[in-house]
Amino acid sequence: EKINFLDQTIKRSVEFAEEWANAGTEAKGLSADSPLSGEEWLGGPYAFLNWLQYMKNTLKAIGAGKSAIHKVKISERSNGQTVAHVYPNNLLEKLLLDNYYLDVWMQEGVTPDNIEDTVALFYKQDNPEGKVSLVLGAGNVSSIVPLDIFYKLYAEGEVVLIKMKPFNEYLG
């Protein structure tokens, strides 16, 4: 059911991607043909759609009995801190955002041997407790609010309330 909802969200987001990017461009006073409008594509529909696809792949892996991080490179820093290298994952990402890397530095006590015990915890519970989260939409990157919402829904299994700031009204 969750994968089906992600598929529907991906489809609808693709349908409205241009409108979404153009709304951000207009809200920031940029011309649609300005090179700077590309930031609205990268920081809006692209970032959101990319995350949705990764979440879909993660849910499929979990459903198949695999680790949620089975494709993530794990290493240790010189001080012993465990690091998960989560971006880029493929040639397109390397080319699109050259020299842009995303590493997650784990808390003390998390090691390459026990990192699996710390991820996808919601999906390891037999009967998870219901929770409600409040997302405050106040940023100037248009994908942040939907990413926060979907993270809470999918990674933590929480219901979400959202409060948008007036300057983000264009996001609907």
Annotate each PLM feature.
Residues 132, 144-172:
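PLP-dependent aminotransferase-like
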Residues 80-81, 126-132:
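A short, charged/proline- and glycine-enriched loop
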Residues 1-115, 152, 166-170:
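N-terminal Rossmann-like NAD(P)+-binding subdomain of aldehyde/semialdehyde dehydrogenases
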Residues 135-143:
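Short, glycine-rich nucleotide/cofactor-binding loops
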Residues 33, 115-126:
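A short, basic/flexible loop-to-alpha-helix module at the beginning of a structural domain
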